[in-house]
């Protein structure tokens, strides 16, 4: 029975490494597009900064497990390297506002935040207690990472556009979450299994939204000048639904000009009457 658990743990751990590696590479088409256009368009840096911080946390957590966390260390070390490249590319092609915003989040979260966690854990906790504290922090932040696409999902629902929610990323995130869920169950690690339940669920919801809106029949027109450019400018401004005809016809109807034959009114009556009164007999 113990051997079976070990085999399952190694199997799911290796599969988790392979699938997670594919997940880390999923945004490559996005960054190829960014590099070609030399613009971040509507894409954001927050998912990549968050993913980097999450990988750093899991490495620190795995180091507390005395060799049992080797498979967690390997994939998250690779993740740190890949996410760092993404962030560098994002900063390179971002406008000034997005660049400053990204650097602020990176400094506060990945440097000051991570340093604070290490200091607290090293100075105030020991042994199994440190593992529990770190595990709780990892679970909490992983839930936040998995919940981050909720804002993207809101934009997809509002705009009926899946342009900024790549299907490949949603698919592999779902598969990865399921794999790590089973890995956590196999090694009986509550902290690894729990957040991946939420990850699998949200990933499935994203794929459903993609299928629904990929072939949406009445796409809305995006104003190129109003596309989000920074992390804070997340909403994609579209033509309001209330101004779109129910039939889906987006043809702009010309406004009817006022009837020039109608006399112009003034406080004293018709303009024509006023002029007549002022004309000499």
Curated annotation (Swiss-Prot):
Signal peptide: none annotated. InterPro entries: SWEET, SWEET_rpt. Keywords: Cell membrane, Membrane, Repeat, Sugar transport, Transmembrane, Transmembrane helix, Transport. It is found in: Cell membrane. Residues 11-97, 133-216 form the MtN3/slv domain. Mediates both low-affinity uptake and efflux of sugar across the plasma membrane. Coiled coil: none annotated. Residues 267-281 have a biased composition (Basic and acidic residues). GO terms for cellular component: plasma membrane. It comes from Arabidopsis thaliana. This is Bidirectional sugar transporter SWEET14. GO terms for biological process: anther dehiscence; gibberellic acid transmembrane transport; seed growth; sucrose transport. Residues 244-281 are annotated as: Disordered. Its main location: membrane. It is a multi-pass membrane protein. The gene is SWEET14. The chain crosses the membrane at residues 7-27, 43-63, 71-91, 105-125, 133-153, 167-187, 193-213. GO terms for molecular function: gibberellin transmembrane transporter activity; sucrose transmembrane transporter activity; sugar transmembrane transporter activity. Belongs to the SWEET sugar transporter family. Gene3D superfamilies: 1.20.1280.290. Residues 28-42, 92-104, 154-166, 214-281 are cytoplasmic. Residues 1-6, 64-70, 126-132, 188-192 are extracellular. Residues 244-259 have a biased composition (Polar residues).
